[in-house]
Amino acid sequence: MENTVIHVQADKGQYTITAIGMDQAFRRLIAFLLETRLMEDRRLIFLTDGAVNIRDRIERFFAFREHTIILDWLHLDKKCYEYMSMAVKGTKAEKDGMKRTLSSILWTGRADKAIKFLNGIKKKSIKNDRKLNELKDYILRKSPVLTCYALRHELGLKISSNRVEKENDLVVASRQKHNGMSWSDKGSGALAIIAAASRNNELDSFLVNKQIRFRLCA
């Protein structure tokens, strides 16, 4: 099992949760949300990279409460760009134009219009039918977790989970994945917990009193 990192943001505060294994991380997330009362009169929004195992955990652990899952915009845009690069042909300007058109459609979260656009690509512009169909399947699968990214962006709301990736780098990756270092699950988890406690401004409390405050930090 690997370290799982969850980053919570509410109002102007934040908190980093880490655990060995996704199930344990989600249990700690629920404990944190209950302790801080962040599930009271609030809308829960999960920004993810679209991984099925993450979505399954969210649906399982939060089945008791209304929530929203949003696919990370950067991940969606990159994935579609890669598929389009393999699926279409033409001059650079023509290919870039098709990619921009698809991106602008998905920016507003309209999966049905995106599929209609892809279906309308002329045969002479198709390089690989299989990749084009895979792109359509991908968009259809992800349609339940697409949103109007343009509106969220305009309102100053989050459209990407890149902050989680940054926290993962700070808590896990930068300390454990370089210099050919090898870690046991126990050692890796312990180091990640210490790093997270430091990020949460509760390292002294954790080391001296063996206590975690479970409070948002600035």
Describe the predicted segments one by one:
Residues 1-218:
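Catalytic center-proximal scaffold of phosphoryl-transfer enzymes
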